[in-house]
UniProtKB/Swiss-Prot annotation:
Keywords: Amino-acid biosynthesis, Aromatic amino acid biosynthesis, Lyase. The active site is at Y23, H101. It comes from Xanthomonas campestris pv. campestris (strain B100). The gene is aroQ. This is 3-dehydroquinate dehydratase. Its EC number is 4.2.1.10.
Length: 148
């Protein structure tokens, strides 16, 4: 059994109502509940945290090094394009992570095309709406099974 951590960046608390044509109609609570259920069905635990504050996400990443977290799933949202501190935190704890995006940032505004995390991620899944999270979790579960 592995302990997994799912982090959501800024404005994802507005899922379901914020630009549903871009981000879909699923709420964050619905996404989290489905993922927790899937992780449990595979014999793992999944903790979820959303924050609009970068330092809260950084501190949670730091804590992951000590709490037995095996893998981090992260949708950094707008911090994707701006946060050296998230990058440094993820590299500092040395845990594998998957970068997740509901939309495909490469089909959007040019400022969204650069990620400070992608080159260090175990994988990047984007463009599939709420299914991006499910696909990321399935990839992590498969990796854990392969490596065990």
């Amino acid at each position: 059994m592995a302990h997994l951590l799912l982090l959501h960046g800024p404005n994802l608390n507005l899922l379901g109502t914020r630009e549903p044509e871009v981000y879909g109609r699923n709420t964050l609570a619905q996404i989290d509940a489905a993922l927790v259920d899937r992780a449990q069905a595979a014999g793992h635990t999944l903790d979820c945290l959303q924050s609009n504050a970068e330092h809260v996400l950084v501190e949670r990443i730091h804590a992951a090094r000590e709490d037995g977290t095996a893998f981090i799933l992260i949708n950094p949202a707008a911090f994707t394009h701006t946060s050296v501190s998230l990058r440094d935190a993820l590299l500092g704890v040395g845990l594998p992570f998957v970068e997740i995006h509901l939309s495909n940032p490469h089909t959007r505004e040019p400022f969204r095309h650069h990620s400070y995390l992608s080159d260090k991620a175990a994988g990047v899944i984007c463009g599939f709406g709420a299914d991006s999270y499910r696909l990321a979790l399935e990839a992590v579960i498969a990796r854990l099974e392969r490596d065990s």
